Amino acid sequence: MHRQAIGIDIGGSSIKAAVVDLSRGSLVGERRSVPSPAMSAVSEMLHAMSEAVPEGTENLPAGVTFPGVVVGGTVYTAANVAKSWIGQPLAEPAAAKLKRKVVAINDADAAGLAEVHFGAARGVMGTVLVLSLGTGIGSALFVDGLLVPNTELGHLEFDGMEAEARASGRARLERKLDWDGYITELNYVLNRTHALFWPDLIVLCGGITGDHPNLADDLKVPCQLKLGALRADAGIVGAAFATTLHEGVWIDKQAKVAGK
């Protein structure tokens, strides 16, 4: 298994990339960032990705996150980026543009991989749910270290409202929720989601957790609850780690070797 890889994290406002040490789950050198042409053509996004990749890394594979469902390297949904991405391959044209092996993965799944193999959920067996709280709500579900990809639990509907409409960053702004009101909604979503999956651990990450480091203390759920450990680097680290895994097969034994 290769010891380093490039992680590329595509967002609505920026594309971030860095070299990742796969034995530690840490960045090597600086994290580069370029503006994201999120609503532009596919070709412009690919060019921006190439601008974000550190120079002198041509021999390293790359993992690329995408804010939507990704199956077999192809995009099937798109959030905060142009809808023209839907139905478009990502891994193949990115590999051609970057001249290297590329693995494409849902952005929340990448953050989950980082937390399970290097962060707050490392070494935890059973069912682990990683929720990314940002503009929307992303999710990654793991069973005994194996990822169940593209769960999109932010679209679960409770009492006529999607989870994202209750407890995302966008919902908090649009509904003018104060902190207590937001905690009430988030607590509701977490407990209803827990009732469906009965996770042993829930990990919360994303921008909202960065703004409120004591968030976990304000929530009450019937399982262990932690904040993510990798914070803003989770997407990059998880994308890079995805290059060590077979396409569509998430093997815990390989993950443990990388996590030593």
Q: Residue locations for each model-derived region?
A:
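ATP-binding/phosphotransfer module of carbohydrate and carboxylate kinases, centering on a glycine-rich
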Residues: 1-61, 70-74, 94-99, 114-130, ...
